[in-house]
Swiss-Prot record:
UniProt-listed InterPro entries: Conjugal_tfr_TraD_a-type
Protein name: Conjugal transfer protein TraD
Gene symbol of the encoding locus: traD
Pfam families the UniProt entry points to: TraD (PF06412)
Keywords from the named record: Conjugation, Plasmid
Family: Belongs to the TraD family.
Length: 71
């Protein structure tokens, strides 16, 4: 049973990573360098700390982008 749980956890982790990669594509950043992408994410994480207005602003942008694809 432990192997089955490990396999399920691994599948879930893999699926999550694929979905996160899809967000990079959806944002139009597919061909950017990995260092730039990581920098954007780190900067975003820093901006979000304690700033609910920024969190709301970025969430609205994301909701709008998903809305255009029916997600």
């Amino acid at each position: 049973m432990s192997k089955a749980m490990t396999s399920d956890a691994r599948k879930k982790d893999t699926r999550e990573k694929i979905e996160l990669g899809g967000l990079i594509v959806k944002a139009g950043l597919r061909y950017e360098k990995r260092a730039l992408l990581l920098g954007l994410l780190i900067d975003g994480e820093r901006r979000l700390k304690g700033d609910e207005d920024e969190r709301s602003r970025l969430t609205a942008i994301g909701v709008e982008a998903f809305g255009h694809d029916g997600e």
